[in-house]
């Protein structure tokens, strides 16, 4: 049985990470692939839990070996998703969720055209600016640069299968969970999960 591959993307500050974290607490048999990154480890982050932290040299070596399904350079740091890990999880029948940017989503689409891709949008640019400012970790010019990049990123919404507006967190979470549930109820998935039951039901005199 093969699992489903979901991709969740959004511009910086849209609330994607918080939504994914809450989703994992509500949905069973959904695994998030831990990305590899050359970014420095932040306080409270654990290697192998939040990211697989690595050097630029090691990262680029894995790129040459086709070790990543997708990778991208974001604000001077590299991020990538292990191809072997994702394929192993899917082969075991586990559903996998990738929390990556739109560039990575495009790369995933080329390898896994059947992947279900979800894009999160903020309710307004004003709201997005407030979220970026409330982080309290960046200078004003950095915030303006990130907002400009976010506007460009949001133009990629047309390349995704689902759009969720993160205006109300609980509603957005419900919408995200609904996408997972609806895809699990598709014919192909249900036949895989319940093939014995279905065979019994459609076989005459099989009570």
Curated annotation (Swiss-Prot):
It comes from the Bacteria. It catalyses: GMP + ATP = GDP + ADP. Signal peptide: none annotated. SUPFAM superfamilies: P-loop containing nucleoside triphosphate hydrolases. One of its GO terms (molecular function) is ATP binding. The keyword ATP-binding applies. ATP binds at residues 10-17. Residues 3-181 form the Guanylate kinase-like domain. The keyword Flavoprotein does not apply. One of its GO terms (cellular component) is cytosol. PROSITE patterns: GUANYLATE_KINASE_1, GUANYLATE_KINASE_2. Belongs to the guanylate kinase family. Essential for recycling GMP and indirectly, cGMP. HAMAP family: Guanylate_kinase (MF_00328). NCBIfam families: guanyl_kin. This is Guanylate kinase. It comes from Acinetobacter baylyi (strain ATCC 33305 / BD413 / ADP1). The lineage of its organism: Bacteria, Pseudomonadati, Pseudomonadota, Gammaproteobacteria, Moraxellales.
